[in-house]
Amino acid sequence: MAVCIIDHDNIRGVIYFEPVHGKDKVLGSVIGLKSGTYSLIIHRYGDISQGCDSIGSPEIFIGNIFVNRYGVAYVYLDTDVNIFTIIGKALSISKNDQRLACEVIGISYINEKIIHFLTINENGV
């Protein structure tokens, strides 16, 4: 599983990339945006040293999220993205090609436990 913890200005949230029943899903929630439709986009680099200006070009459009009148978006999207190819890249929340928030996608703590468990079982330990 991969995770992106968003904490950019007043925009906050958590987005998970995980397999659910054999399909990859994007799950989470975001707060702090105005009501409307926004895009989730994976960018080439995970370099946020200069904010969203240094994350490179857009590579993968994940889908649109819809923010309600209370400023909350609940995310539940299907994706064909291979989770392990996006770790270390940046995820942006954009509207009209303007990047409003961006953070780096990392490996989640839960994923490390699963990998450790599978390694133990494969070695017969």
Curated annotation (Swiss-Prot):
Disulfide bonds join 52-102. InterPro entries: SOD-like_Cu/Zn_dom_sf. Keywords: Disulfide bond, Host cytoplasm, Virion. It comes from the Viruses. GO terms for biological process: superoxide metabolic process. SUPFAM superfamilies: Cu,Zn superoxide dismutase-like. GO terms for molecular function: metal ion binding. Its main location: virion. One of its GO terms (cellular component) is host cell cytoplasm. It is found in: Virion; Host cytoplasm. Belongs to the Cu-Zn superoxide dismutase family. Superoxide dismutase-like protein with no enzymatic activity. This is Cu-Zn superoxide dismutase-like protein OPG175.
